[in-house]
């Protein structure tokens, strides 16, 4: 490539990675350029771009995002419609506003060998918890116990309870239904763990539809309570 042997192919530079590679090579390359192309479509095929693809092309630096983060944001947007995350610009602004919390929380996510423990719902819950100022050290400890299945104290039993619940429900729920269940149940069990670990009072029972945290939109506003419904 540095010697100028670069094939742009029929796709031209319809991909930021191609353009970046050309720029970094320092070699002049002849190519066709399309002006005023719709960002919502692929230039070469005309096919509609995915939301994830459009977000990556936004005016913000989204190089830090990945499929896990974007699928999690999509789930939050569907469950809490007032967050307006189904719209590209609002989603991009939301991701940037809460980048610190999102990156901190997703560092605790691992690829589990037990499929029931891999859910966008669990990721969504710990991101929202981080947005509600649950300390990273407590989220990390909760998730460590959740993945390992080993506990050392009473508070950590809530992580084991969640683990058992998700493995059980994964046998009867699928897709969005399971993700919504994992979202709400993880949030509740994490809240119980955190409050118990810090000596606060917390209800032992979790009712369907209960959600212990606020969900915020890109402007920092709290999503209206009527959108807080479990699927």
Feature roles, as predicted:
Residues 1-36:
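Short alpha-helix boundary/capping and kink motifs at helix termini
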Residues 23-231:
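Solvent-exposed functional surfaces
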